[in-house]
């Protein structure tokens, strides 16, 4: 057209999202709210054992949701035992039915998968169960499970592919071991189980497996819960050991062999010490690997469009607006470099990104003071800095740690676990004793932590906590009466529920 300005290229979509997990779906639905043409590509590569699942990503299918439900199964077993002391006549032997539990959990997950499909359809988001790979600028190839390929174009792209469990790279690991991707839909009870790893996934799974009555051993290479407050991590480990979970420390598996096939079968694990030549062997019905997760970024054609990744970790560096080094490509969730790997973070980031792209918003995702909970038998809630990080950031002389054990009233009648629940706050003495770290070990830790997380966002100080009247008799009230500092070395042991 003579003299006319060149028209912009017409794309099939305004936004194509690779990954149908919590973050990707949140971004898709939010972008659709602003009448944008949105497509979601989601594809689950089966595990080495062949496990696959529906729309919704890791959290819904193979992490937070089934994990919390199975943790609840274990808590109910403890509640049944406690109930005898409260006058209930409960049979001496309590049996757990694995198949019944997994069927109920999988039925619930199935309803969630269906709900996500319906929500996308209602919001006019195009969904394809296909594997997305960049093939050129603004272009992506979608391959379905039958191998059929289609090419789509979009003005902008969002990578929200998440992570998958890492394997050891030893003989027998992919042939005979399971991961958390397999555990929650395992069609038979795992029996005597070895959990390899010290991640929160490892300890949570070990905890509920032991809680439903299984023989559980955890093999740990170095420390528990790397990245978390180590004082809290060690208390979790001690509590798990006291409740029958065995720990093999400073060993790593070097070979897994099948002794007998079956559901479950029998496996032999050969492991080597991390600091000597010592070799040990053990027999288990199931070996579950929980040694970490790897970002799903290496096989989606990023090199074709020039998106930079950290070659060692596969993580994607982004700006504070989740933009990659390629301006029209964004990324959110667990695949981001140096960001918190949590579902609600991905959801928040996805929503806010869509609002910035399509609604003129300037609000960015705040990755500071993100609360989290580890659902070990004794739950661990945290917000803000670990003690180690606080010392590193402010200097040991500029922090004050207030702490106390506490005994939930409900546990006094069965007379169990006194001086196991623990509360700790870390304060910056140079900033009006502002609370920079909040940590609690006890029942319902997530429920306790959530409200305090809002307070930390508002700049909570020790004085404000002290002037807050507690609710009696609940666990959270301990935070309104903390008076003993770690520095003082004074006793924090409790004689009763009211301190």
From Swiss-Prot:
Q: Does the keyword Disulfide bond apply?
A: yes
Task: Give the subcellular location.
Answer: Cytoplasm
Which positions carry N6-succinyllysine?
A: 68
Describe the reaction catalysed, as an equation.
Answer: [thioredoxin]-dithiol + NADP(+) = [thioredoxin]-disulfide + NADPH + H(+); H2O2 + NADPH + H(+) = NADP(+) + 2 H2O
Q: Which domain of life is it from?
A: Eukaryota
Q: List the InterPro entries.
A: FAD/NAD-bd_sf, FAD/NAD-binding_dom, FAD/NAD-linked_Rdtase_dimer_sf, GSHR/TRXR-like, Pyr_nuc-diS_OxRdtase, Pyr_nucl-diS_OxRdtase_dimer, Thioredoxin/glutathione_Rdtase
The UniProt note on the cofactor reads as follows: Binds 1 FAD per subunit.
Which residues make up the binding site for FAD? 22-23, 42-43, 58-59, 63-67, 131-132, 161, 200, 334, 341-343, 472
Cross-link Cysteinyl-selenocysteine (Cys-Sec) placement: 497-498
**Do you know which SUPFAM superfamilies this protein is assigned to?**
FAD/NAD(P)-binding domain (SSF51905), FAD/NAD-linked reductases, dimerisation (C-terminal) domain (SSF55424)
Recorded GO molecular functions are: FAD binding; identical protein binding; NADPH peroxidase activity; thioredoxin-disulfide reductase (NADPH) activity
Cystine pairings recorded for this chain: 59-64
Task: Write down the top EC class of this protein.
Answer: oxidoreductase
Assembly behavior: Homodimer.
- General function of this protein: Reduces disulfideprotein thioredoxin (Trx) to its dithiol-containing form. Homodimeric flavoprotein involved in the regulation of cellular redox reactions, growth and differentiation. Contains a selenocysteine residue at the C-terminal active site that is essential for catalysis. Also has reductase activity on hydrogen peroxide (H2O2).
What name goes with this protein?
A: Thioredoxin reductase 1, cytoplasmic
Q: Which organism is it from?
A: Sus scrofa
């Amino acid at each position: 057209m003579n003299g006319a300005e060149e028209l912009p290229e017409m794309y099939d979509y305004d936004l194509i999202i690779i990954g149908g997990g919590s973050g990707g779906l949140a971004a898709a639905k939010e972008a659709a709210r602003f009448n944008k043409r949105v497509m979601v590509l989601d594809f689950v590569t089966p595990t080495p054992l062949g496990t696959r699942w529906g729309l919704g990503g890791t959290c819904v299918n193979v992490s937070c949701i089934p994990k919390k439900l199975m943790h609840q199964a274990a808590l109910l077993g403890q509640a049944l035992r406690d109930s005898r002391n409260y006058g209930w006549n409960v049979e001496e032997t309590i049996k757990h039915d694995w198949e019944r539990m997994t069927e109920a959990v999988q039925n619930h997950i199935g309803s969630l998968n269906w709900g996500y499909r319906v929500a996308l359809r209602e919001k006019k988001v195009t969904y394809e169960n296909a594997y997305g790979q960049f093939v050129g600028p603004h272009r992506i190839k979608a391959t379905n499970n039958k191998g059929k390929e289609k090419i789509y174009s979009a003005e902008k792209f969002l990578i929200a592919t998440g992570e998958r469990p890492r394997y050891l790279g030893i003989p027998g690991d992919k042939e005979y071991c399971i991961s958390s991707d397999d555990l929650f839909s395992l069609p038979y009870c795992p029996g005597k189980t070895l959990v390899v790893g010290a991640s929160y996934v490892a300890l949570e799974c070990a905890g509920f497996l032991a809680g439903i009555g299984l023989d559980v051993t955890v093999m740990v290479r170095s420390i528990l819960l790397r990245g978390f407050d180590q004082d809290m991590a060690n208390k979790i480990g001690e509590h798990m050991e006291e409740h029958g979970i065995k720990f093999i420390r400073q060993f790593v598996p070097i070979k897994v062999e099948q002794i007998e096939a079956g559901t479950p079968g029998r496996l032999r694990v050969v492991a080597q010490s991390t600091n000597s030549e010592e070799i040990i062997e053990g027999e288990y019905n199931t070996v579950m690997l929980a040694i970490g997760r790897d970002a799903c970024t290496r096989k989606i054609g990023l090199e074709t469009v020039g998106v930079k990744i950290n070659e060692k970790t596969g993580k994607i560096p982004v700006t504070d607006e989740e933009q990659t080094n390629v301006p029209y490509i964004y990324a959110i969730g667990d695949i981001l470099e140096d960001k918190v790997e949590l579902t609600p973070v991905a959801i928040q980031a996805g929503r806010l990104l869509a609002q910035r792209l399509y609604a003129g918003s300037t609000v960015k995702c705040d990755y500071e003071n993100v609360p989290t909970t580890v659902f070990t038998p004794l739950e661990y809630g945290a917000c803000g800095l670990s003690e180690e990080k606080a010392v590193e950031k402010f200097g040991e002389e500029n922090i004050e740690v207030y702490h106390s054990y506490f005994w939930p009233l409900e546990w006094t009648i069965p007379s169990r676990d006194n001086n196991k629940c623990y509360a700790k706050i870390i304060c910056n003495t140079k900033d009006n004793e502002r609370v920079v770290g909040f940590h609690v070990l006890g029942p319902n830790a997530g429920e306790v932590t959530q409200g305090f997380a809002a307070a930390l966002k508002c700049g909570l100080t020790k004085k404000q906590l002290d002037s807050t009247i507690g609710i009696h008799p609940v666990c959270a009230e301990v935070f309104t009466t903390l008076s003993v500092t770690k520095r003082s070395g004074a006793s924090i042991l409790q004689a009763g529920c009211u301190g």
